[in-house]
Curated annotation (Swiss-Prot):
The gene is fucR. Transmembrane segments: none annotated. Keywords: Activator, Carbohydrate metabolism, DNA-binding, Fucose metabolism, Transcription, Transcription regulation. Transcriptional activator of the fuc operon. The keyword Cell membrane does not apply. Coiled coil: none annotated. Residues 19-38 bind DNA. Pfam families: DeoRC, HTH_DeoR. Residues 1-57 form the HTH deoR-type domain. SUPFAM superfamilies: NagB/RpiA/CoA transferase-like, Winged helix' DNA-binding domain. One of its GO terms (biological process) is regulation of DNA-templated transcription. This is L-fucose operon activator. GO terms for molecular function: cis-regulatory region sequence-specific DNA binding; ligand-modulated transcription factor activity.
Length: 243
């Protein structure tokens, strides 16, 4: 019965741009709580996307909802710069850190002093920025440049990471949904973040308030896997970490 109901939800979403939980509840004659449970399962399976009380079907040929890097740089830039500045306190001489290709980490790289650390990243803009520092040992993931996101895609990433003991992985994401799942706008960046999240000794999530209660096209992991979080919405961030 549940499988049939969930397929009915998918069928309805295929014929609409998006639908609310209430609309699905009325269509299928079940409670909103039942619909929410079904939507959570369908989202975990990667079939639908939930955002602000609405659900839409993910068309497999177009699993990429992200903005280009230069657009993301301008979005909430003051908050991102402040969050990045706070993250500097977590970085010490001698550390091996990894950065993702997010605009928030680019703001961090801009403010990073020229100290004796190793930095591993898949970000082309961050490589360009940190290439100006003489004491920072910069390690690029290499691979094919995905220009839209300013990141490198390397199928040999797993073997490359075997020789690196990463002390701290600093990253951002497209959103955190109500269940604590971490999402990104595309599979390219989500795969990189998921891998680093598992390998690093500690992780530091940098996220501005616009990202809470949002999902995306590709799942990174869960907030349970993150050791620390910095946000401009401290109350929400604290409740998520302690939940």
């Amino acid at each position: 019965m549940k499988a049939a109901r969930q397929q009915a939800i998918v069928d309805l979403l295929l014929n609409h741009t998006s639908l609310t939980t209430e609309a699905l509840s009325e269509q299928l004659k079940v409670s909103k709580e039942t619909i929410r449970r079904d939507l959570n399962e369908l989202q975990t399976q990667g079939k639908i996307l939930r955002n602000h009380g609405r659900a839409k079907y993910i068309h497999r040929q177009n699993q990429d909802s992200g903005d280009p890097f230069h657009i993301r740089l301008k979005s909430h830039y003051a908050h991102k710069a402040d969050i990045a500045r706070e993250a500097l306190a977590w970085i010490e001489e001698g550390m091996v850190i990894a950065l993702d290709a997010s605009s928030t980490c680019w703001y961090l790289a801009r403010q990073l002093p020229d100290i004796n650390i190793q930095v591993f990243t898949n970000s082309h803009p961050i490589c360009h920025e940190l290439g100006k520092r003489e004491r920072i040992q910069l390690i690029s993931s290499g691979g094919t440049l995905e220009r839209k996101y300013g990141c490198y895609v390397n199928p040999s990433l797993i073997s490359q990471l075997k020789s690196l003991e990463i002390d701290l992985f600093i990253f951002s994401c497209e959103g955190i949904d109500s269940s604590g799942a971490l999402w990104d706008s595309n599979a390219i960046n989500a795969d990189y973040k998921s891998m680093l999240l598992k390998r690093a000794a500690q992780s530091l999530l940098l996220i501005d308030k616009s990202k809470f209660n949002r999902s995306g096209e590709a799942r990174i992991g869960h907030l349970d896997e993150v050791t620390h979080i910095i946000s401009d919405e401290r109350q929400v961030a604290t409740s998520l970490v302690t939940a």
